[in-house]
């Protein structure tokens, strides 16, 4: 199957089928922001703006990589980009592999920069494709978008389940090091299985500028592949995908694992502004989500703006109730507790819950 056809299949499945984690959550329910009964600030004067990788954002949010690579995905990316431009948030594109294989698909990606000339836009390529296509081809992906950064996605769980997946991860860290020589920041991005502190240390050493943890709790790409396998009659891949549907490190745990190495983006089950606030209070520099905007984007930009505006208003309320007048205060001064499964996990991983308030300013 061509990459382009697979991309439209993925989009349709995410729009129509239940693809989120089944039995493992992101961990946000284990996180409690300590309420300030005396916030002593005006809610309407709270400043959501922040800087991320040298670019100013009106709010600490990125519309995560969703799609591209098929003509039918162009209006979806256009709607997302228009919303990003209007609200001043960042936006990523789906894997640009299809544009390497077929230059006619470039417009499904470049429309994002066309519709969002001032936004923080990041490109996207799989780690496996760096080895396959080489650094010059990857550089063209940056130029295609006039991108402010490039995400290198680590989706080896999906590759292991996908019948046509690339299962060769040899030399991947060296390839990432090579990509880090490009003249844009590189974001190492998991796609639903999270990143550990051990891998975060290796990625920092390789030269990445940020880590998007892509933890368990949101879209399960193993789950997406279950539907593809079922529809094609591939019972072995279907069973394998079901077994690994919830495999990996949940988002909150992964943020705590990675936060001391490089700036972190919290992705994976972020569904409300309260989730964004909790992410930043744990040390993330921004939060991100994709699935909540698929349905709205299929309708149009106004629907995306409405959905995202709701989340940003929820973030503002959370900041007000924590007495935080700006994003830096939320990241460095808010008080937070972690209980339940997440506390047990981070304790076993050597993280002292008493150190939650010690957040690095990287």
UniProtKB/Swiss-Prot annotation:
Any one GO MF annotation of this record: oxidoreductase activity
Ligand binding (substrate): 6-7, 95-97, 158
Protein residues bound to FMN: 65-67, 95, 124, 189, 219, 269-271, 290-291
Hydrolase keyword on record: no
Biological process terms in GO annotation: isoprenoid biosynthetic process
Record-level GO cellular component terms: cytoplasm
Protein name as catalogued: Isopentenyl-diphosphate delta-isomerase
